Regions:
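Short, polar/proline-rich extracytoplasmic segments that appear immediately after membrane translocation
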Residues: 2-73, 180-184, 189-195
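Extracellular adhesion/glycan-binding regions together with long Ser/Thr-
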Residues: 2-3, 123-162
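Surface-exposed interaction patch
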Residues: 25, 30-31, 35-37, 80-131
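Intrinsically disordered, low-complexity boundary segments flanking structured domains
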Residues: 38-44, 49-50, 94-100, 152-157
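A generic structural signal for short beta-strands and their flanking turns/coil linkers
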Residues: 50, 75-77, 106
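Generic structural motif
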Residues: 54-56, 110-112, 164-167
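Short beta-strand segments and strand-loop junctions that repeat across beta-rich extracellular domains
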Residues: 55, 113-116, 146-148
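C-terminal, structured domain-capping segment
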Residues: 70-97, 149-195
């Protein structure tokens, strides 16, 4: 009799274990699906970079090709530079590809003015905006070799802006005989950097 009772207890206990496992599993399943949720979304974000752009109206032709100069010789030419960038910028002028013989550059004065009113190389209608941005020898100008030490005050806003530049050279009236047969050359480079 006691043997039968023990067996029933074991059966009851054994049956209770799987029932408990099933019940706990059901509770976990219900818990995993019982949370409320909500989201909010910011629309797709986009980025694009701005631009700085410069052009000029020289038609890829040097401002000066002056030969057979004598002391006191002088001439002026104008160039118009246009900024069309989407960013505001600062523009500087500096020299490139400089060379001279017989110290001609040391006797050649260069004057550069910023202004407006002229779109032709002959400077018709040019009005200076103020004092010259450079006035010295070509040798001195040759030290201006980058944006960092370039000359100029133009700070165009975004969009299309123009600036005229008048460049005047004059060979010193007291140029010595040692400069005879001399040569000088330099390129003019305008560079814009965003402000």
């Amino acid at each position: 009799m006691s043997f039968i009772n023990i067996t029933r207890k074991q059966l009851v206990a054994g049956a209770a274990v799987p029932v408990a496992v099933i019940a706990s599993g059901a509770m976990v399943w219900q818990a995993s699906y019982s949370a409320f949720s909500a989201t909010t979304t910011n629309p797709t974000n986009n980025w694009s970079s701005g631009t700085v752009e410069l052009t000029d109206n020289d038609a890829n032709t040097a401002l000066f090709t002056a030969t057979n100069l004598k002391p006191g010789a002088t001439a002026a030419r104008c160039i118009t530079v246009t900024s069309t960038g989407s960013l505001a910028s600062t523009v500087k002028l500096y020299g490139t590809d400089y060379a001279t013989t017989n110290n001609l550059a040391g006797n050649l004065n260069l004057k550069v003015e910023e202004g407006s009113g002229s779109t032709s190389a002959d400077c018709a209608g040019f009005t200076a905006a103020g004092a010259a941005i450079f006035d010295g020898t070509l040798t001195a100008f040759s030290s201006k070799t980058s944006f960092a030490n370039g000359v100029g005050t133009w700070a165009p806003a975004a969009g299309t802006q123009t600036k005229s530049y008048r460049v005047t050279y004059a060979l010193n009236a007291a140029t010595p005989d040692s400069a005879q047969g001399g040569t000088a050359k330099v390129g003019f480079t305008w560079e814009a950097q965003n402000s």
